[in-house]
Amino acid sequence: MSGPAADAAYTRPMADPRLDLHSLLLCDHAITAQDGKVSAIGLFSQINVSRLPTTYGRLFIVAVLEADPGEHQVTLQVVSPDGRPLLQRPPQMKLNVPPNATTANIVAELKGLQLKELGRHRIELRAGDRVLGSTPFLVSLIWQGRQAAKA
């Protein structure tokens, strides 16, 4: 084989390594044991606030991925109900999946999340421009005594 077709065969980019999201959880705390097992404590999908804007002190994000061995770059982003990214500097993580492994876990702590509106938000996990998956969470206003908190 010779000519342009042969040249194209040698310069064609290789397929991206496999990186598939299996689970994406929000929780109060997460622990990675010495053997690699992850414990997620206090799973939730709703954040109750008494007023807006507010700062949510701390939460953990746990992701379980199926991945080819090697290095992978992923980014977490919080997205508002109208689709705006909330994190100006979203956490970027490097995963090193060892040979013979097929899965990888991420445990990320997020402190001081600024919430400015009610409704369905989501956490997205991305590899470059590709959204691997997301999980929703609802921001709701709670009542305090006889008065509704002012939003």
Features from the language model and the residues they span:
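Contiguous segments within soluble domain cores/interaction surfaces
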Residues: 4-6, 12-118, 122-151
